[in-house]
């Protein structure tokens, strides 16, 4: 069974890395990788949330008439067979919202992609005013970058930290302390990168630039190489830098 599980992981990871999507991080041994039409994720069966969700966002795909689903459902991917998942009702009346990692607002171009964004593997417990405040403002800013630059590459992730918020629901879904998004933007023949690290707590009035973080420091904090498809020379040059002016983060 372990050999079969490793073979499945190897084949899926090879598929993911072979695609060379710039949004993808370096996949570690043992990660449970799920590839959907609109996003790729790494599932954490102990916490019942995704460790990260990566996706490409194109300006040409920001519009569409795909309909939001009325509820969330378990992810039917065969890769997840045998693993526990959270349920929609785990969040009901809990005081925590179902926070999208791949936003539904970025999924309107395809009903399939929209439906996938409502899998439980694409959501994490978020404090409601955070989900509807800084997290939403960041989603909107990233859409503006997609319009301006044509395509952006995004990875969203959860940082459990000290798990000071505990768990939610009968399934014991772990509530992360922090969330992050890292963004790769094509810029004048090269790229820019920026990360945002946000506490999972009641909203405050900080501007987005106050959450900005160099991607290389985020990588050290989470122990993962982001945007693994970038040439190393470009990564060394741009990851330590926060391009506040270039990206309009005033």
Regions found by a protein language model. Name each.
Residues 1-4:
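Positively charged n-region of N-terminal signal peptides that target proteins for export
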Residues 15-250:
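Domain-level detector for secreted/extracellular nuclease and nuclease-toxin modules, and
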Residues 6-18:
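Hydrophobic h-region of N-terminal signal peptides that target proteins for export
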